């Protein structure tokens, strides 16, 4: 799983940062999921190594413009490219009306199916490999955070051990690789889990923006390998954060700490902390790391690989 940050500024773009969008690349299935779609997102995708043709799902947190103004342009481009089979879009009530109205008034007709899902807290998508859920955040308008949880899978199959037990290859190997119990022709009962390595723990990613510190974000980020959390303001500007219902760096760090997350990546920074100002982004990073040391600061086109965890590794660190 690979995370690419396409936009890391809050409210408005700057020369070095576009507005909100994060891409999740799933190489094992040549699929791309997008979280928020601020103005200019399609340009950011084109400047990256991502492929628009692989886009299959878009998750919108809320209906503020810096999170949705790039959506119609991206969808129109997907149609003109002609190589997108279908896109499912998930978001708050009103998202479908927005897309339909923009399409009608701009005379935009899509050459591929688009399905808009009005979400409510809970599981919103599930397949054999992933579960995606959402939860309420605390912002000025209805806002949702997302959690992508990869399902655990059986560890690596020990072919040599299977051969040593004179287990015939073929269909039976497939069953054993899945951890199933198989009865051989000679009557032996083989437990597939005994021929597989440690269970590969599914990776978990949480995406929480826009919000002030809230229990909903903590729940979504529980045991997350990566928590992507907004950090619009520095701690000294907490009054503005409470007024506008955005997070400070310390709120983001406290969320990661309370959730037991393994890594925090902050994003959605106010342009007021540009280089040369009294407070700069490097100062915001220090604030967060004082509370949660495993904190990084996102920048446009930053790529973060999410490694797998194994039960043995978790036992060693006492998780």
Swiss-Prot record:
Keywords annotated in UniProt: Endonuclease, Hydrolase, Metal-binding, Nuclease, tRNA processing, Zinc
What is the reaction catalyzed? Endonucleolytic cleavage of RNA, removing extra 3' nucleotides from tRNA precursor, generating 3' termini of tRNAs. A 3'-hydroxy group is left at the tRNA terminus and a 5'-phosphoryl group is left at the trailer molecule
Cofactor info, note text: Binds 2 Zn(2+) ions.
SUPFAM superfamilies given for it? Metallo-hydrolase/oxidoreductase (SSF56281)
- Cofactor(s) of this protein: Zn(2+)
Q: Where does Zn(2+) 2 bind?
A: 66-67, 210, 268
Highest taxon listed in the record's lineage: Bacteria
Q: Which PANTHER family match?
A: ZINC PHOSPHODIESTERASE ELAC PROTEIN 1
Molecular function (GO) terms for this protein are: 3'-tRNA processing endoribonuclease activity; zinc ion binding
Q: Which organism is it from?
A: Nostoc punctiforme (strain ATCC 29133 / PCC 73102)
| Residues annotated as binding Zn(2+) 1 | 62, 64, 139, 210
EC top class, as a word: hydrolase
- Give the EC number: 3.1.26.11
Q: What is known about what this protein does?
A: Zinc phosphodiesterase, which displays some tRNA 3'-processing endonuclease activity. Probably involved in tRNA maturation, by removing a 3'-trailer from precursor tRNA.
Q: Which family does it belong to?
A: Belongs to the RNase Z family.
Residues of the active site: 66
Recite the lineage of the species: Bacteria, Bacillati, Cyanobacteriota, Cyanophyceae, Nostocales
Q: What is this protein called?
A: Ribonuclease Z
Question: Which InterPro entries does UniProt cross-reference here?
Answer: Metallo-B-lactamas, RibonucZ/Hydroxyglut_hydro, RNase_Z/BN
């Amino acid at each position: 799983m690979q995370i690419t940050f396409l936009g890391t500024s809050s409210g408005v773009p700057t020369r070095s940062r576009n507005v909100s969008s994060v891409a999740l690349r799933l190489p094992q299935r040549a699929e791309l999921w997008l979280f928020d779609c601020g103005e200019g997102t399609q340009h950011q995708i084109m400047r990256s190594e991502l492929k628009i043709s692989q886009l299959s799902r878009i998750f919108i947190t809320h209906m503020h413009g810096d999170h949705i103004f790039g959506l119609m342009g991206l969808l129109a481009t997907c149609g003109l490219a002609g190589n997108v089979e279908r896109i499912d879009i998930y978001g708050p009530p009103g998202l479908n009306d927005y897309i339909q109205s923009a399409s009608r008034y701009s005379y935009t007709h899509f050459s591929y199916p688009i399905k808009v899902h009005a979400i409510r807290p809970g599981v919103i998508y599930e397949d054999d490999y992933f579960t995606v859920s959402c939860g309420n955040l605390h912002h000025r308008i209805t806002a949702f955070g997302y959690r992508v949880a990869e399902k655990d899978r059986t560890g690596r199959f020990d072919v040599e051990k299977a051969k040593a037990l004179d287990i015939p290859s073929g269909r039976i190997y497939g069953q054993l690789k899945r951890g199933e119990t198989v009865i051989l022709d000679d009557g032996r009962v083989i437990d597939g889990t005994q021929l597989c390595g440690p269970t590969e723990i599914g990776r978990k990613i949480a995406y929480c923006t826009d919000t002030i510190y809230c229990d909903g974000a903590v729940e979504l980020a529980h045991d997350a390998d990566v928590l992507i959390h907004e950090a619009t303001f520095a701690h000294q500007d907490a009054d503005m954060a409470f007024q506008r219902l955005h997070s400070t760096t310390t709120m983001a760090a406290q969320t990661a700490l309370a959730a037991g997350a393994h890594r925090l990546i902050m994003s959605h920074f106010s342009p007021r902390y540009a280089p040369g100002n009294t407070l700069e982004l490097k100062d915001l990073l220090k604030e967060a790391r004082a509370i949660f040391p495993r904190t990084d600061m996102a920048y446009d086109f930053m790529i973060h690989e999410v490694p797998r965890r194994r039960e043995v590794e978790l036992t060693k660190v006492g998780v």
